[in-house]
Amino acid sequence: IDERRALVRDAPLGRAIDWTDSRADAWAARRVDGKQRAEFYRRTGMPIDGRYLAPMFEYHWRQRRSDVRRILSAKDFLCFALTGRVVTDPSTAAGYGVYGITDRRWDPELCAYWGLDPALLPEIAVADMPAGGLNPAGSRLLGLPEGIPIMVGAADSVCGALAMAGLAEDTVSIVMGS
């Protein structure tokens, strides 16, 4: 995404990197000691490893930092491509490794630790909120009416657990694997 929030179709920065890419794991393990790991967990509610977007970005893109305009998960990129809005939800934000669960925003200290400018990260909104209407390009691509609401959405594991158990009390759902 460039500075005008337009898709850069002719100059990708590289191939998409998904959560299964573990090349940054050993590097992140060396960079984060036990005390830091406990502090990251306290602040984010998530264990930290090289598959989270913040360490992955630092590991893979540190030489090309000046070229990067936005950092998005695959879901967030799809939402952007369909609506033009750069937005994520809290469950996906947790996968960035810098989302503070107490104040529900990007944690500036964790962003600084990984060398991330918070301005590169998407806005955070609730998952069941419309991100916007389907844009003309998305309408043509999908054969759907322009303007239909596109929701912010949530992480697949969160949606799967919700679909299995709903919001009912006394219900257990187990998600294993991917």
Per-range role (PLM):
Residues I1-S178:
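Glycine-rich phosphate-binding/catalytic subdomain of phosphoryl-transfer
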